[in-house]
């Protein structure tokens, strides 16, 4: 009968995962269990997900990072993973949706983040098991002092991740095993092998999260809805991050906002030239009617052109050439 091998938070560290499997001499008969957080922060989430999906005798517990993808709560790390997974992202998230919140066999209990001592696993709250923000708040109200595992007295061993314990795992009484040793931060990837309860680790090859953040900053920035931000929201988004490309975006936005006098002049000229029927059929008809009746000025146009896209669309309708978002080949004619 095979062993049970429980691996701490992998976070896209595929090379280290393979090395750890070699270090424990993983056999096809061994059950491989992940505490969750396969993805985010590391360089190879697609490979890690593919490894567990394709390997027989494998179990992945729902981590808070998988739960973020399942619920569509995408912050910077999740946006990077979405781009890394590319066309396979939706399929990967559909698979994540099927993950259990805990695992238990005759050797060990496995959760991602925490459990309430004394409560059966099938009665635990999912948000506590996976370590979501709401779950951590709820747990703090139930276990007000110390860490939950300091109050754990059940005879069954419990393995978990979520909270980085440092380069070394958290080991207590031969029953409590905290296995997140910061692989994505350049520390170690750790496994617990049962029934012997031995611990094995391999060092990370780099501070992967620092590297991944730098490498994917521009691709993530390019996915932002820059054309559809309101001007105040666009200004706020530009202020949050520094990147040379954002300097180009800021200059582009300023150019669009400064185009209002030219757009007013173009609308007034067109309103004078077009016959009534053509004006009514024109895509910029509301603006042209304002111009014809003398009610169009920069302030009135600014109330319409509240986003770059609306400004570009109006410019295209009026025949005023304006550049599209930097990095795009298209522009309004």
Identify what each model region corresponds to.
Residues 11-16, 40-43, 66-71, 103, ...:
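Active-site environment of divalent metal-dependent phosphoester hydrolases
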């Amino acid at each position: 009968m095979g062993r049970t091998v429980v691996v701490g938070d992998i976070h896209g560290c595929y090379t280290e995962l393979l090395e750890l499997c070699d270090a424990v001499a993983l056999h096809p008969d061994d059950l491989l269990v992940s505490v969750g957080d396969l993805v985010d922060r590391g360089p190879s989430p697609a490979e890690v997900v593919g490894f567990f999906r394709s390997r027989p005798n494998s179990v992945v517990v729902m981590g808070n990072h998988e739960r973020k993808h399942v619920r569509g709560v995408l912050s910077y790390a999740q946006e990077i993973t979405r781009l890394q997974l590319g066309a396979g992202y939706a399929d990967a998230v559909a698979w994540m949706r099927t993950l259990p919140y805990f695992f238990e066999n005759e050797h060990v209990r496995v959760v991602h983040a925490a459990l309430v001592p004394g409560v059966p696993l099938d009665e635990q709250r999912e948000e506590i098991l996976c370590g979501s923000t709401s779950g951590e708040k709820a747990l703090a109200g139930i276990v007000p002092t110390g860490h939950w595992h300091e109050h754990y007295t059940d005879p069954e061993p419990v393995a978990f991740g979520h909270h980085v314990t440092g380069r070394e795992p958290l080991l207590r009484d031969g029953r409590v095993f905290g296995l997140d040793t910061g692989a994505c931060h350049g520390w170690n990837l750790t496994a617990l092998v049962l029934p012997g309860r031995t611990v094995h680790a391999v060092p990370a090859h780099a501070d992967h999260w620092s590297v991944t953040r730098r490498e994917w900053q521009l691709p993530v920035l390019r996915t932002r809805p820059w054309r559809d931000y309101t001007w105040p929201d666009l200004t706020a988004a530009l202020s949050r991050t520094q990147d040379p490309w954002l300097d180009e975006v800021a200059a582009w936005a300023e150019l669009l906002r400064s185009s209002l006098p030219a757009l007013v002049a173009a609308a007034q000229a067109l309103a004078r030239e077009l016959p009534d029927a053509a004006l009514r059929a024109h895509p910029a008809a509301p603006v042209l009617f304002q111009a014809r009746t003398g009610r169009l000025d920069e302030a009135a146009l600014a109330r319409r052109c509240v986003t770059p896209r609306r400004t570009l669309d109006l410019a295209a309708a009026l025949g005023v050439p304006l550049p599209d978002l930097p990095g795009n080949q298209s522009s309004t004619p």
